[in-house]
Amino acid sequence: MKVSFSPAAQAELLDIAAFIAQDNPARALTFVDELESKCGALGGVPGIGTLRPELGEGICMLPHGRYLIFYRAVNQDLRIERIMHGARDIGGDDFEVGESLGG
């Protein structure tokens, strides 16, 4: 499956890197690399995550450290919708209703 990132997920990767870099710039780079690698690997095993229907149609979640990767698979595409800290109060309002995989 082709893996893509929503604009929100792209922005969250930058925010995560900036937050971690405040204390450890080197770790910020490696952690974001790990997140991106895990997201890329989802294309090969999209069913590995937990389905979260309360968040939106087809939304699945996979943890990475203290962060949660939210994604959706449609046809031959897998879109990373959000990457959020697990301590957040996450609900359906955090996901766009009816947003297409195209961008």
What is each residue range found by the language model?
Residues 2-59, 93, 100-103:
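Basic, Lys/Arg-enriched alpha-helical interface segments
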Residues 47-77:
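Basic/aromatic recognition patch in beta-strand/loop cores that engages polyanionic ligands
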Residues 67, 72-103:
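Enriched for short, Lys/Arg-rich terminal
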